[in-house]
A protein has these predicted regions:
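Flexible, active-site-proximal loop/turn residues at the rims of small-molecule/cofactor binding pockets
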Residues: 57, 94, 165
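Sequence-specific dsDNA recognition surfaces
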Residues: 26-41, 54-84, 103
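Amphipathic heptad-repeat alpha-helical coiled-coil/stalk segments that mediate oligomerization
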Residues: 214-215
């Protein structure tokens, strides 16, 4: 995915170099904040996995080690049920990390924000814009806290971004295949990791015998 991200960065840099008009992010995107899950309801395994700030990595959502639940809380809004292709932003700790959801049955925890573009087709554009070093630097500069940094969703939405609607839509259309390739690659990696975790213990225990396989 590094090569894909680099290709996207080149395109974004080209866009940023020619667009002089700026708008606040709030004019093109909203954030959905996560639900405050109760730790007493957590299970070692379950139908749903809860995505916290530690699961938001640069460019992906890693659900490894996520707490689980079997039943959805009654007070939780449906927009906290994550869909493949959703983009999340970390608001605490290593603030400003942005990743794409590539699995089903994931739930949005508090201090993680989900992107809700005013125009859905702008999502690839917004993902790569938020991944751009200049925007991440801005987010880090407004984060507050001593022991742990916290990023305000409201202040983040007040940040300015170079934006011209027609050009942004055109760029988003070009970036969309790269965005989809990243999702596909991450899904393949998740599948391979799952197979490894399932097969390796069986190989180590001798449950699976590969001695007769000729290479």
């Amino acid at each position: 995915n590094d090569n894909l991200e680099q290709q996207a960065t080149v395109l974004v840099n080209r866009y940023l170099s020619v667009i002089t008009e700026t708008v606040a992010f709030s004019e093109i995107i909203d954030f959905v904040n996560g639900f405050a899950f109760q730790s007493r309801t957590y299970l070692p395994a379950g139908q749903y996995r809860i995505i916290t700030i530690k699961n938001v990595q640069d460019g992906k959502i890693d659900s490894t080690g996520a707490s689980c639940i079997d039943c959805l809380p009654q007070r939780m809004k449906t927009n906290c049920i994550l869909q493949i292709g959703d983009v999340l932003l970390s608001l605490t700790g290593n603030v400003g990390r942005v990743g794409i959801v590539c699995e089903n049955n994931l739930l949005l925890n508090q201090r993680v924000a989900k992107f809700v573009p005013h125009r859905k087709e702008l999502l690839p554009f917004l993902y790569f814009i938020f991944r751009h070093p200049s925007i991440k630097t801005q987010m880090e500069s407004i984060a507050k806290g001593t022991a742990q940094l916290n990023l305000s969703p409201i202040e983040t939405l007040n940040l300015s971004v170079p934006f011209e609607k027609t050009k942004a839509l055109e760029l988003s259309k070009v970036l969309s295949p790269i965005y989809q390739f990243i999702i596909s690659n991450n899904q393949q990696n998740i599948l391979l990791s799952s197979l490894r975790d399932e097969l390796l213990p069986k190989l180590m225990s001798g449950e699976i015998d590969i001695s007769d396989i000729k290479i």
